[in-house]
Amino acid sequence: FEIYNKDMLSSDKKYTLNNIPAAYAVMLQNMETITRVYYGDLYTDNGHYMETKSPYYDTIVNLMKSRIKYVSGGQAQRSYWLPTDGKMDNSDVELYRTNEVYTSVRYGKDIMTADDTEGSKYSRTSGQVTLVANNPKLTLDQSAKLNVEMGKIHANQKYRALIVGTADGIKNFTSDADAIAAGYVKETDSNGVLTFGANDIKGYETFDMSGFVAVWVPVGASDDQDIRVAPSTEAKK
């Protein structure tokens, strides 16, 4: 167990998998799926049951709790190929040359498309966007702009980071105040478009991330916001 646990804390993994948090960030946001969370991703296998938390514990738990508050509505997934600063273009490793950034948007409670503007109580304070890149050497040109449609119902609305990749690993924020105080806050335009630039998206090689991952959510949700729906046996039309 010692070798395995040490490998989880390494950025150069030999026995464990890279990007466990990013995988959960994608799965826990997906529409009409129920994600099975693996015990070994939350806790180490040595010692007593649930005795020692894994290095991914905080991020996975943050994502699971945020699912209750934010993950609802229609979904749009898209990949973008953004201009780079040229430093990574001559690498012999194909992965290190890729400039792909994957995005997945959930529009919010009772909002099924980006054009919907008639929602309900929690429509504006729910929804989220997940950003993932697999290139740890990704460096974008300063002109690069990633424009993500959060939905027109989210026009002129502030968003803040829930998780965000940094050179020191993934940072977690469990409140609006903490994320805003750290400077991780943005505002959509009049069409509900949220824009990310070269300073927002960058590849890193850390124990919990090989590439980049971030999740952004609307500012203003109450601590007890719950957008889950009641179970039903009715067939979906």
Residue ranges and their predicted role:
Residues 46-50, 139-141:
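Extracytoplasmic/secreted cell-surface and envelope-processing proteins
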Residues 1-45, 59-69, 108, 121-122, ...:
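Conserved alpha/beta catalytic core and glycan-binding cleft of carbohydrate-active enzymes
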Residues 38-44, 75-100:
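Acidic carboxylate-rich catalytic motifs and surrounding loops in phosphoryl-/glycosyl-chemistry enzymes
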Residues 90-152:
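Carbohydrate-binding surface patches
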Residues 149-168:
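Solvent-exposed beta-hairpin/edge-strand motifs
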Residues 5-17, 52-60, 142-147, 169-199:
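Short, polar loop/linker segments at the starts of domains and inter-domain junctions
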Residues 135-137, 166-167, 220-223:
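Acidic glycine-/aspartate-rich tracts in secreted/extracellular proteins
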Residues 173-237:
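C-terminal beta-strand-rich structural cap/linker in extracellular carbohydrate-active enzymes
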